[in-house]
Amino acid sequence: MKLIVKVFPEITIKSPPVRKKFIRQLGKNIRTVLRELDADIVVGGVWDNLEVETRLTDPKVLQGIRDRLSCMPGIANFLQVAEYPLGDMDDVVAKCKLHYADLLPGTMFSVRCKRAGRHDFSSMDVEKYVGSQLRMQCGAAGIELKKPDLVVRMEIRDQRLFVVHDQHKGMGGYPLGALEQTLVLMSGGFDSTVAAYQIMRRGLMAHFCFFNLGGRAHELGVMEVAHFIWKKYGSSQRVLFVSVPFEEVLGEILQKVDNSHMGVVLKRMMLRAASAVADRLEIDVLVTGEAISQVASQTLPNLSLIDAATDKLVLRPLVATHKQDIVDLATEIGTADFARHMPEYCGVISVNPKTNAKRNRVEYEEQQFDMAILEQALERAKLVSIDRVIDDLSRNIDIEEVSQALAGQVIIDIRHPDAQEDQPLQVPGVEIQTLPFYALNSRFKALDDTRQYLLYCDKGVMSRLHAHHLLSEGHANVRVYRPS
C-alpha cells in the first residue's frame, strides 16, 4: 500500500527553512507511530508531500496505518494510490481503467489531475483526454464537473503517475514536536479532555497535570483517559503525567476559606501548583478546559482573578464553546464515555459562589490558608512517563489470576469497545459480559454479588488495576482472567 500525505496548508506558506523543519518533523512522527505496525515502513519526503509505503498486506494492519495517520497532527489529508511509470495519454487511460472501469458504467463522472514537473501537456489536457476516453470505453452516462457521482483522481509528478483509490481526512495542525510544549490541567471530564485534544490538534505537545481530589479511583480514571488521548493523537512524542495530591489542600480551603470564595481560591491554588510543575519541566504555557460562565468560577471577572495567581500564559481552547458542542466533540474523539463515568469535585464545594469576586477579598481569604500545605502537596507530586503510567500503577499489585474460567463464573471483558468489536472474546460454556474499563467502577455495584467475576483485558494490566480497586471497595468476588 502506498499513501501520499498532504501536509497542513498553513505549513506550505512558511519560509523555506521553517517549512522544511515542519515537514521533517512530520516524517519523523509518522515513522515513530507506524513502526509498531510495520518495522520496515518507508517514509519519503518532497517539498509539500510525504510518501508512505508498506509491503504488508494484512487488512487489519493497513487499516491501522490509515487510522493512525488520520489522528496525527500535521496532516491535512492523505491519498491511497497506485503508482506507475508515466506513459503516453493512452497508457494513462489504461491505468485509470484498471481501478475505475467497474465503477463508471451508468455514472456521471469527472476527472481531476494534479501535475508537478515539466511536461508537454497541461493538467486540463489530461482531464479532457482521459475523461473522453473513459466515457466512451467504460459505459459512463456522461461527464459532470460540478456534482459528479464519481471523481477519477490522479497525480502526475515528473515521470510518475499516481492513480488515487481513496482520500482520507487528517487532523490538520502542525506536527507535534515542531512547536512549544504545554501543561494541561486534567480533571478527566468533558472539558479538560477536549481542551487537551484541541491543543494537540493544533500541534502543541501536551503534558498532563492532575490534581487528585477524589482518591485512587479518580486518579486511575484520569490516567486512563490521558493515556487514551496520548495514544490516539500524540504517541509520536513522549510526555509526562503529573499527579499532585490535593486532598489536604482542599481540606484547608474547606476549613479556612469562606464558602462563597472556595471555587476561585481552589482554582488559584491549582494554577500556582501547575506553574511550579511547569517551571520544573521548563514549560511556559498552561492549558485549562474552562469556558465563559459555564460555572460560577468561570465568569470573566473570576477568570481574571484566577489568572492573576500565575505569571504563565493560560490558554483556554474552549473559552467561547457551548457545552453541547464540547460534548459532541468529546463523543467524536472518543473521550465522552470516559468523562461520563469520571468523578467531578471542583463544582460541588461552593454554595452560593461569587460570580464577581473581588481581588482584595480573595487575597484576604488566601491569607487564612497555610501555604505550607500547598508546598507539601508539590513535594509529593508524582511524575510518570505517559507510556508507562498504567504499567507503573499495576506493578506492585498482587491479585489472584486464573487461566481457566469455570461454568458459573462470569468473564467481564473490560477492553475498549473498539477492541471488543474487532476481536470478540469467546470462551465456550462461560458467560461473557462486555463492560468497558471506564464504566466498570460505576456499574459493578449493580451486578449480582452472588456471582464470581473474572476481569479480562489483552495484557492483564487494566484488569489487575480495576480488580485491585474493586477488592479495596469490599467486592471479594473479583479475579483476573489471563488465558494461557
Swiss-Prot record:
GO terms for biological process: thiamine biosynthetic process; thiamine diphosphate biosynthetic process; thiazole biosynthetic process; tRNA 4-thiouridine biosynthesis. Keywords: ATP-binding, Cytoplasm, Disulfide bond, Nucleotide-binding, Redox-active center, RNA-binding, Thiamine biosynthesis, Transferase, tRNA-binding. ATP binds at L185, M186, K267, G289, Q298. It catalyses: [ThiI sulfur-carrier protein]-S-sulfanyl-L-cysteine + a uridine in tRNA + 2 reduced [2Fe-2S]-[ferredoxin] + ATP + H(+) = [ThiI sulfur-carrier protein]-L-cysteine + a 4-thiouridine in tRNA + 2 oxidized [2Fe-2S]-[ferredoxin] + AMP + diphosphate; [ThiS sulfur-carrier protein]-C-terminal Gly-Gly-AMP + S-sulfanyl-L-cysteinyl-[cysteine desulfurase] + AH2 = [ThiS sulfur-carrier protein]-C-terminal-Gly-aminoethanethioate + L-cysteinyl-[cysteine desulfurase] + A + AMP + 2 H(+). Disulfide bonds join C346-C457. It is found in: Cytoplasm. Residues 63-167 form the THUMP domain. InterPro entries: Rhodanese-like_dom (IPR001763), Rhodanese-like_dom_sf (IPR036873), Rossmann-like_a/b/a_fold (IPR014729), ThiI_AANH (IPR020536), ThiI_fer (IPR054173), ThiI_N (IPR049961), THII_Thiazole_biosynth_dom (IPR026340), THUMP_dom (IPR004114). It comes from the Bacteria. Pfam families: ThiI, ThiI_fer, THUMP. Residues 405-483 form the Rhodanese domain. Its main location: cytoplasm. Its EC number is 2.8.1.4. One of its GO terms (molecular function) is CCA tRNA nucleotidyltransferase activity. The keyword ATP-binding applies. The active site is at C457 (cysteine persulfide intermediate). SUPFAM superfamilies: Adenine nucleotide alpha hydrolases-like, Rhodanese/Cell cycle control phosphatase, THUMP domain-like. CDD domains: PPase_ThiI, THUMP_ThiI. Belongs to the ThiI family. PANTHER family: TRNA SULFURTRANSFERASE. Catalyzes the ATP-dependent transfer of a sulfur to tRNA to produce 4-thiouridine in position 8 of tRNAs, which functions as a near-UV photosensor. Also catalyzes the transfer of sulfur to the sulfur carrier protein ThiS, forming ThiS-thiocarboxylate. This is a step in the synthesis of thiazole, in the thiamine biosynthesis pathway. The sulfur is donated as persulfide by IscS. This is tRNA sulfurtransferase. It comes from Pseudomonas syringae pv. tomato (strain ATCC BAA-871 / DC3000).
